Amino acid sequence: AASDVYKRQMNDVLLPAKKGGYGVGFFNAVNVEMARAIIETAEELRAPVMVGTAEILLPAMELARVAEYLIPMAEKASVPVCVHYDHGLTFEKCMQALELGFTSIMYDCSTASYEENIEKVAEMVKICHAMGRTVEGELGHVGDNAGAGKLENPSDYFTDPETAADFVKRTGVDSLAVAVGNAHGDYAFPPKLDFERIRVIAEKTGIPLVLHGGSGLSDTDFKTAVKEGVAKVNIFTDIDKAGKRGIEAGLAAGEKSMMGLIPYEIDAMKEVVRDKILLFGSNGKA
């Protein structure tokens, strides 16, 4: 059913963010508690927000199940909530997400060769744009932290601004995930972001940029990245760990049931979402 959620496109939240110099948080929600923490906090702060899941997170909750709670919650929200499928690695799963009603797709072909990345992403853009949906691509490679700090020349994996301009022109993507010293998961070494690179990529591509591996970066890192052209910041590890801390707090307080633990879990996650939204500056923008 074509409903209001289809109007809540990635571009509807990211283009004003890019123009207004603030960032929009994208938070993965692998269960209803996470979804509630994200959406309720966004409503309280009057902030546009993006929610979804990633292919790598599907063991926690399969795509069709995620769609069952997430899309209706997004539709009923009093602020714009864009439902996004993150790090789609296979064409089939991306298609399933579109079929289920996700309004934007990140098709991650960043480990493929440059030409293959362009070819695959351009095809996804063609499909999504025909359906009135949006696409995020990735250029350069945002790895995980297991090996990130140990690379001989980490900048070999960084996004090149000239190449980024070519990639955007040839694929037609709506937003671009960049590799600028960021990595997924917990940082083994303090990350050093290349802000000048972000600024040049933003200038040359003209589209909203996306920062993956946001958990573990400093407040200053986020603020500067947003100032230089990042419009979407992905957060999962921080909110995931907060949920666990909330449960531990509930157990320590003597809670004896799953039901009793839920408010603790939600409150702990809401605190992280709140901090991030205020940090990115998207509060009051909805």
Task: Kindly label every feature range from the protein language model.
Residues 1-6:
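Short, small-residue-biased leader/transition segments that mark boundaries at the very start
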Residues 7-26:
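N-terminal amphipathic alpha-helix/helix-capping segment at the start of soluble metabolic enzymes
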Residues 12-14, 30-52, 56, 64-77, ...:
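Alpha/beta enzyme core
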Residues 29, 83-89, 208-219:
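Glycine-rich beta-to-alpha transition loops that act as phosphate-gripper elements at the mouths
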Residues 57-59, 112-114, 239-244:
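Short gly/pro/ser/thr-enriched loop/turn and capping motifs at secondary-structure boundaries
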Residues 87-94, 138-154, 173-175, 254, ...:
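Electropositive, surface-exposed helix/loop patches at the edges of structured domains
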Residues 218-286:
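C-terminal alpha-helical cap/extension of soluble enzyme domains
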